[in-house]
């Protein structure tokens, strides 16, 4: 009794004993208790911007303003950079992406690679036995005989192997992990060109390693030089923005995703955080990805324009602009968006950024327009640009429309077990043909514009891993997709443009390997018969007699639908005397065929027709505003020697 009375007397309603029990609501009783709140910074930034994820939250650490869930945009004050997160403290690691496996940092002006993570390496690079991770099936030795021509002033000498220098040591490790043994021709030149700070226009045949051609030099220089300082305006902004250092524009979501997947490999353990944005997917989740940090942004023009209008992306810090499949983006009507992105936003102007344009074809009119984007650039032509590879065996079969399905069944039954890509012209036909093949017990799937992004991704994944060995596709997959081990391409429906045919069959025979391309031809395809005839002859392929018959029936072989404009697409238009530019500098060419070597060429180029309509009179073709496509016709004459008229995108 005395003990109880003593305990009552000792009670204190202000007792602050931390060990005393307290009431916990039922819905919180099973949750793990977090660390105590602090009013001072923990292991993160001591002076973080108040406008991070936690508004007016000045705490660092995991949930603070500079931790994994915090951070303002992509910058620090050059003391510590964590791959896209803000951290203002010059002395501390401050959380950030060092909490993520395989993520490095930029600390005190130095690149600090992250620790190796074996599980992540397997996810990114696979194993040598995995057919999905075999350097996209690259046969590097077959590249040795491909001729290369580089023209421009002070063309740097090509590299012959991957070494450090000129490549960053961490990038070199990732290249080795990806099992790239030697640079492809386009990579041999792009690495020294970009490291010299030069602009580049590269024309290379499909499957020649163009993605590595721009990722390797851009990432190498980024690893060495670190992030750009944060603009003063970003420190005062209430809206979280991404400030990428490198911007890659691609025409389709599939190509953008493919570039992003490659970027993830080669940014492994680095401070660079890649992000991808494209239409047809939830923009909210993409904005959240951007808010976590973005140093290399891969985007389609339409979605990027949307994000710029929303104020979620700033291009003020872009050092490197890459246009992949540039001609296709213009053909698809993206010219107004590209023009607005490059010239109408806060991107640094020509001369203050490096611009790289990559594609398999660059017709003369595209080259002329490149003058608006490039400064003192080097023109790189690899192989027979704008044509097909001799590694692809082309077979042209005369098949009427009513006989196509039965002919396809015979073709597939006689083929090997490799992956076959079948191109059709319409979405309806893609679904119809896929259903037909499944009913015939073939493992088929399809991609086209009406399928959701997740459906397209699942279809591509099934095709790549072999669960479906037949992929029926519309033109959405014709450009840029790098699917390893495609042994056969079937043009069930031929396109109306010979350039599209070139890019379709380029899905096989990639990167020095061999492949087969079969086309179903009939008189409904007479508009490309001349272009196809010349293409087969150029690639030393067998020309079926019926092509000659159809050419004779159509007089001159019909309209070539763009083939004639491609004939000189592997030449630098600045060498022509009909274009402005005055005297020309040196050019380098390299061929292992025996007679090739280094040399120089000079050609006069004073004066010339300056108008976009060319040297013709009234009715000359030109670029102009025409609805949303960006194409138009000019009826005015811009001819005349020394004309000061300038081609315009508008």
From Swiss-Prot:
Q: Per the UniProt record, which EC number(s) apply here?
A: 3.6.4.13
Q: What region holds the Helicase ATP-binding domain?
A: 191-380
Q: Iron-sulfur: present as a keyword of the record?
A: no
Q: Where is this region: Disordered?
A: 1-114, 549-650
Highest taxon of the lineage: Eukaryota
| Positions of the Helicase C-terminal domain | 391-551
Question: What's the protein name?
Answer: ATP-dependent RNA helicase DED1
């Amino acid at each position: 009794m005395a003990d109880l009375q003593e305990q009552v007397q000792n009670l204190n309603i202000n007792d602050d004993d931390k060990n005393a029990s307290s009431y916990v609501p039922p819905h919180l009783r099973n949750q793990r208790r977090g660390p105590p709140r602090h009013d001072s910074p923990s292991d993160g930034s001591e002076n973080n911007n108040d406008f991070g994820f936690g508004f007016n939250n000045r705490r660092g650490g995991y949930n603070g303003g500079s931790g994994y869930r915090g951070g303002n945009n992509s910058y620090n004050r050059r003391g510590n950079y964590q791959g896209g997160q803000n951290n203002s403290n010059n002395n501390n690691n401050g959380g950030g992406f060092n909490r993520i496996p395989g993520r490095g940092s930029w600390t005190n002006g130095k690149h600090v690679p992250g620790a190796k993570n074996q599980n992540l390496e397997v996810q990114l690079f696979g194993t040598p036995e995995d057919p999905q991770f075999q350097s996209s099936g690259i046969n590097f030795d077959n590249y040795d005989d491909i001729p290369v021509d580089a023209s421009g002033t002070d063309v740097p000498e090509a590299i012959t192997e991957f070494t450090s220098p000129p490549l960053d040591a961490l990038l070199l490790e990732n290249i080795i992990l990806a099992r790239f043994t030697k640079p492809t021709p386009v990579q041999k030149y792009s690495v020294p060109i970009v490291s010299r700070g030069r602009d580049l226009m590269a024309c290379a045949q499909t499957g020649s390693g163009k993605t590595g051609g721009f990722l390797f030099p851009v990432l190498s220089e980024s690893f060495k030089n670190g992030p750009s300082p944060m603009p003063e305006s970003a420190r005062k902004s209430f809206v979280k923005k991404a400030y990428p250092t490198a911007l890659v524009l691609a025409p389709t979501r599939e190509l953008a995703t493919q570039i992003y997947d490659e970027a993830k490999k080669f940014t492994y353990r680095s401070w660079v955080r890649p992000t991808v944005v494209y239409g047809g997917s939830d923009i909210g989740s993409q904005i959240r990805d951007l808010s976590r940090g973005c140093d290399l942004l891969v985007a389609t023009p339409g979605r990027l324009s949307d994000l710029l209008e929303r104020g979620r992306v700033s291009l003020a810090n872009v050092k490197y602009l890459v246009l992949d499949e540039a001609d296709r983006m213009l053909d698809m009507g993206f010219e107004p968006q590209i023009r607005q992105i490059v010239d109408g936003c806060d991107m640094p102007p020509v001369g203050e950024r490096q611009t790289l344009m990559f594609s398999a074809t660059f017709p003369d009119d595209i080259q002329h327009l490149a003058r608006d984007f490039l400064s003192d650039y080097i023109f790189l032509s690899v192989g027979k640009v704008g044509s097909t590879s001799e590694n692809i065996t082309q077979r042209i079969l005369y098949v009427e429309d009513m006989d196509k399905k039965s002919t396809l069944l015979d073709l597939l039954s006689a083929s090997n077990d490799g992956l076959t890509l079948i191109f059709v012209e319409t979405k309806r036909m893609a679904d119809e043909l896929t259903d037909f093949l499944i009913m015939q017990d073939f493992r088929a799937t399809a991609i086209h514009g009406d399928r959701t992004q997740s459906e397209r991704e699942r279809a591509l994944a099934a095709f790549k891993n072999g669960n479906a060995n037949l992929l029926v596709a519309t033109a959405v997959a014709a450009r840029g997709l790098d699917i390893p081990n495609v042994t056969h391409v079937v043009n069930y429906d031929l396109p109306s443009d010979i350039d599209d045919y070139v890019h379709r069959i380029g899905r096989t025979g990639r990167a020095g390997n061999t492949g087969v391309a079969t086309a179903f031809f009939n008189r409904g395809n007479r508009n490309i018969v001349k272009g196809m005839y010349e293409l087969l002859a150029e690639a030393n392929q067998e020309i079926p007699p019926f092509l000659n018959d159809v050419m004779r029936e159509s007089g001159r072989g019909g309209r070539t639908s763009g083939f004639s404009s491609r004939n000189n697409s592997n030449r630098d238009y600045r060498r022509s005397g009909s274009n402005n530019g005055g005297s020309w500098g040196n050019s380098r060419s390299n061929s292992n065929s025996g007679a090739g070597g280094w040399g120089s060429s000079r050609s006069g180029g004073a004066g010339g027709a300056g108008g976009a309509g060319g040297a013709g009179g009234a009715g000359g073709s030109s670029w102009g505003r025409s609805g949303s496509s960006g194409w138009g016709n000019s009826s005015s004459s811009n001819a005349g020697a020394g004309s000061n008229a300038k081609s315009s995108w508008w």
